Each structure stands twice: as C-alpha cells, then as structure tokens.
Amino acid sequence: MTDLPNNVRWQLWIVAFGFFMQSLDTTIVNTALPSMAKSLGESPLHMHMVIVSYVLTVAVMLPASGWMADKIGVRNIFFTAIVLFTLGSLFCAKADTLNELVMSRVLQGVGGAMMVPVGRLTVMKIVPREQYMAAMTFVTLPGQVGPLLGPALGGILVEYASWHWIFLINLPVGIVGAIATLWLMPNYKMQTRRFDIFGFVLLAAGMATLTLALDGQKGLGISTLTLCLLIVIGIVSILWYLWHARDNDRALFSLALFRNTTYRIGLFGSFVGRLGSGMLPFMTPVFLQIGLGFSPFHAGLMMIPMVLGSMGMKRIVVQVVNYFGYRRVLVVCTLGLALISLVFMAVALMGWYYVLPLVLFFQGMINSTRFSSMNTLTLKDLPDELASSGNSLLSMIMQLSMSVGVTVAGLLLGMYGQQHLGADTAGAHHVFLYTYLSMAVIIALPALIFARVPNDTSKNVVIGRRKRSER
C-alpha cells in the first residue's frame, strides 16, 4: 500500500477510524451496564435494552445502507453516518432515564449501520482491485483493536470518572472524522436499481415488533393486548414479505437464496448459533460485577483474554476447517462453546478466579472458529448473481440474532432473578447458575442443524467461495 497516493491513504485512515468507533462501541458499553442501572435508578435486569436497541437498529438499517451510498454518494452517507453516531453518543451521555438512553442508542445504531458497509464500499472504489485485500486488512485492524480496548477502557472510565464518558469519548473522534470526510473523501456514486422500499418496511416492521414482543411484559411492562398486537404485526409483516418477494426480481432479498441447501442450513444455523453466543458478551461482565462483586475495571480486564483468543484463532481457522471439514468443526465448536460456558460458571463459583482468563481465552478461540466457519459455509455455494444479496441477508441476520440473544439473556435473568438482583442478593449465585445452564442448552442447539452439513473437507470447496465473495 506504500505506492498509493497520499490522498487515498488519508481516505483509508478515515474509514479505519469509522470502523474503530463502531467496534469500540459494541464492547465498551457492556462493562458499564451495572453502573448505568445504578445511576438511572433501574434494575440491572432491564439494561439489556441498551444493547438490544443499538444492535436491532443496525440489523434493520443494514439493507438500505449500501443502496443509499450508491445513490447519494459514499462521502455524503459516510459523513451522515459519523454525524448521527456522534450525535447519538452525545444524547446517550446526556440521558437521564433508561428510555432516553435507549432512544439515543437507536440514533447511534442508524449511524453505525451505515458506517461499516459504506466504509467497505469506499475502499472498493478508491483502491485498485489487486490491493483491495491489503487495504481492507489495514482499515479493519482498528476494528479488531476496538473490542480489545473496549471492556478495559469502559471499566476505567466507569470506575474513575462516570459511565457518561464511554459515550463522550466518541465526540472528538467523530468531529475530526466528519471534517476529514468532507475535506478528503470523494463522493463516488453508482447507477442503482430501484430500492425495494415496501419490502424494507415489511422486514423492518417484522424484526422490530417480534424482538420487542420477545422482551414482552417482563422487560417492557406492556399489556397483554399490546403484546398480542406486536406478535400479529410481526408475523403478518414477515409473511407479507414472503408473498411480496415471490417471483419479484426487485425484492430486497430473493427467495431463490433459500433454494440453495448449504445457504439455507448456514443461514438458519448462523441465526440460532449467534443467538446463543450473542448472550456471552452481555452476560459475562454483568455476572462478574453483580454476581461476583468485581469492579468495572477488573471485569473489563477479564474480557481481554476472550478477545485475544478470538484474534489469535483467526490466523489458523482456514487450516482447521480445511483439515476437519465444516460439519466436524461446527458441531464440535458448538458443543465446546456450551461446555466452556459451564466451565466458566463452575470455576467462577468455586472462587478459582486465576483460572478465569484461561477459560475466557479458550471461549474466544472457539467462538471465533465457529463464527468464521458459519460465515464462509453460508456463502460458499451461492452463484455469483446471488452472492451480494446473500451476503447482505447474512449480515442482517447476524445483527438480528445477536439482538435476540441479548433479549433472551435478559429474559432468563428476569425469570430467575425476579424483581431485583444486586451484588448483595443472597441468591445471586443461584440466579446466574440457572441462567448459564439455560444458556448452555441454547448454545448447544445449533449442533443439530450443523450435523446436517455435508462432510466435505476438500480445500477448494471450503475456501473457494470465500475468496470469490471477498473480491
């Protein structure tokens, strides 16, 4: 990349900082949830909505982000994404109630949904094709550093300042990024086909209402009538979209995707798999602080081995899948993740805190292997004309499943923890024990789906589609 013009390198730096802001925000908030609950006068059982509101908004907005960038221009959309994300951060810091915080996180999510896919599109347009992989490696590196710094940085800010600062630190970065975007980034546009607005609204309504209905009366305090109405709207919206997309070449996502057996298994497995593993980043810092009495900083530090294990495993995951095949890797990793979550709970309750970093390191390795395998399995057999649509749907499902996973984790805590749960609660350990046992069952369930994957260990078949989808 040293032979790229200076202006292109500066543009890559802008995209990299956008990736960093978005990835940092996904991990820095988890550590601060108990402190937020105390400051806002809320039960920790309700704080999962701070995560759900952001991730669900990202899932809803993802399908529109690429089209908007092509239609309006990458500079305009990337600038808008940074401004919305920064404004959302400011409103989060100023929030005095949980409802205000949740609404501010929705605004953040709109910006976050546009930032990463539009950033990828920008890199594709400003660098030569032969240097695309090197450029993407460069801009995504800060995105890998974000999850590493997030938990510890969140713990430091909460312990030595206040939780408001986990959002305020986005302001200077966002202001500089917005100015640099207007100054340095070209406004590339592309010819676009007509956007399926009706299909987008149907899918958005279905995802949002069903996720809110899942949180239901315990989490949101809504009436039975409202709950039933949300469920009906959600189901009708999804069924209406399926009817709308039938034989519709302009549909947001073609139903032809589901005729591909590998894609169908991979997508369903990815949804159920991430539903389980999406609970862990939310539950771990909450358990460490509320269940074990760790300080926010100590809890944040404990999350670092998990991120290191995940990053380290990415270097060898292709070789592992090539050697053992998708079916063995996915089934073993799924059952292994369920087991390691129980080991983490057992080691913690026995007071062997010095072993926890090692357990979390292995948890990160297993989770990373499973994520990478699910992604490439899902896309590897798609024909070229469906690859882009299939990748977009997979990205949306990934975010949606993590949103549902955090919601389910909050429901489990609420079911076992009743009205309130604090560090001084006598039954806190039992509450988290039952919650983790239930989570382990949910995490293990996708093994039944992955057992149906053809046992193909051919190297070309395993990584061939991955290389084509990255071009």
Curated annotation (Swiss-Prot):
Domain of life: Bacteria
Cellular localization per UniProt: Cell inner membrane
Name of this chain's protein: Putative multidrug resistance protein MdtD
Native species: Enterobacter sp. (strain 638)
Database matches in CDD domains: MFS_LmrB_MDR_like
Residue runs in coiled coils: none
Keyword terms, alphabetized: Cell inner membrane, Cell membrane, Membrane, Transmembrane, Transmembrane helix, Transport
Transmembrane parts of this sequence: 12-32, 49-69, 72-92, 101-123, 138-158, 165-185, 195-215, 220-240, 265-285, 286-306, 342-362, 393-413, 431-451
GO molecular function annotation: transmembrane transporter activity
